[in-house]
Amino acid sequence: MENNTEVTEFILVGLTDDPELQIPLFIVFLFIYLITLVGNLGMIELILLDSCLHTPMYFFLSNLSLVDFGYSSAVTPKVMVGFLTGDKFILYNACATQFFFFVAFITAESFLLASMAYDRYAALCKPLHYTTTMTTNVCACLAIGSYICGFLNASIHTGNTFRLSFCRSNVVEHFFCDAPPLLTLSCSDNYISEMVIFFVVGFNDLFSILVILISYLFIFITIMKMRSPEGRQKAFSTCASHLTAVSIFYGTGIFMYLRPNSSHFMGTDKMASVFYAIVIPMLNPLVYSLRNKEVKSAFKKTVGKAKASIGFIF
């Protein structure tokens, strides 16, 4: 039955209603979030403290860690509170805020991934010009531009989604405030909103994916010209790890946002969103950083200094 009263709060259905699964899921999500927190904030601190990591590649990695922490924190704590207390309500303004920051950080990540791919292209394909290509100003502009695009995109999508009238129901068939489940609750004409999402997300993803694919195409060509089989295998292994994370990120994003609203199945979307919003931020420090010898060396030095400081105190 249609309700003509505008909603002031939403009810997030969550992942499951089974009471026996709430505590186990809370523990799992808490574990994932703690790894995300320690991994990403630890990576930022490590890069700041070690002068050997003050290079363009690690500058982008530190920003990637920041946005991973940002969009995970926009979603995961509220989900965990729901598991622990059973509180599924979220105020209208809180829902809009959660949606805004999630979109802002997820978009910034998309452009940062493209910047990282370009940085690797410059390092591997144009090594003699690398220092003049990836200057401090260029790196800063790429990072700042990623955040500007992120918050601009978030403003567009938040305004586009929350300008609609939600008078049919306030029950969101999802575990956080996202565009597809919110659009299904609207009693306004959703066509324009769906087209805005499709074209804006499509443009952002297409631009970033093209930069990544073209960069890696030249990288692979350069790798194939390497004479050392060991060096070639190592470079291929590194690129494969990066491309795996990129494929998961863009694959789930395209699956979520570049389909008509009528083809969304909330159960499937929830599972995709778990990977997109919660698991990927946990994996990125491992895929992009902890496999790196320079990061491992910096970590060992930091731990050694910490042990020495503790020994000196006691």
Curated annotation (Swiss-Prot):
Domain of life of the native organism: Eukaryota
The protein's role, per its UniProt record: Odorant receptor.
The organism's taxonomic lineage, starting at the top: Eukaryota, Metazoa, Chordata, Craniata, Vertebrata
Glycosylation sites: N3, N261
One of the Pfam families matching this protein, by short name: 7tm_4
Segments in the Extracellular topological domain: 1-23, 74-97, 159-194, 257-269
Keywords: Cell membrane, Disulfide bond, G-protein coupled receptor, Glycoprotein, Membrane, Olfaction, Receptor, Sensory transduction, Transducer, Transmembrane, Transmembrane helix
Family of this protein: Belongs to the G-protein coupled receptor 1 family.
InterPro entries given in the database record: GPCR_Rhodpsn, GPCR_Rhodpsn_7TM, Olfact_rcpt
Gene Ontology MF: a single term: olfactory receptor activity
TM regions (residue ranges): 24-44, 53-73, 98-118, 138-158, 195-215, 236-256, 270-290
GO CC terms of this entry: plasma membrane
GO biological process, one term: G protein-coupled receptor signaling pathway
Topology with respect to the bilayer: Multi-pass membrane protein
SS bonds (residue pairs): C95-C187
Residue intervals annotated with topology Cytoplasmic: 45-52, 119-137, 216-235, 291-314
Annotated compartments: Cell membrane
Protein name as it appears in the record: Olfactory receptor 5B12
